[in-house]
Amino acid sequence: SLKVVPHCTLFCKHPLKPDQRRYSAARMKTFTCCCGNTLHFENTRCLGCGRGVAFLPDALVVAALEPLGDQGLRALLPWQWDMRYRRCRNDTDYQVCNWMVRDDDADAYCASCRLNRVIPDLSSARNVELWRRIEEAKRRLMYTVLRLGLPFTGRDHDAHGGLGFRFLADTDAD
């Protein structure tokens, strides 16, 4: 028989009490920096040591990064020591993504951002802010999909059946 478990226990170190479950959608697993400080999913800098941090989709962790000059970035994780990364283009251009791209990946976008098919007009500061917020929610969704090991294919590999996101801006009716 199936055991029903509140979804918050999948990502939280400590199961929530019944009166706290309504907040479970906002809670995610925390991570630990190499300095011992707690890192959260959206962090881009460790508040303890000041190092830049980012999410590594291939390792499913938020980790501190060490710049390697022209050779990209290295995660300060023993099991990822030889791996080189670079920032997602949506981070370098708009500061809306904290996921990394492996240096041997030809795509400029991370595994989450490359699923975008349409984004709003980014010449509007309002659209950039709304897009940042919806990208944050999408990255949480994609983290959950990856963590649960659910299969998915992007539209870049399957144009008709692959997963893709169309983020449209509201239009004013004049």
What are these regions (language model features)?
Residues 133-174:
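Auxiliary, metal-adjacent structural segments of Zn-dependent hydrolase domains
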Residues 50-60, 113-122:
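Short Cys/His-rich micro-motifs in 6-15 aa windows
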Residues 37-40, 53, 92-95, 101, ...:
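Cys/His-rich microdomains that often coordinate metals
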Residues 28-31, 42, 81-84, 103-106:
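Short metal-coordination and nucleic-acid-contact micro-motifs, chiefly zinc-binding Cys/His arrays
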Residues 108-134:
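Fold-level signature of zinc-dependent metallopeptidase catalytic domains
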Residues 2-5, 18-21:
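Short, low-complexity intrinsically disordered segments enriched in A/P/G/S/L with frequent Arg
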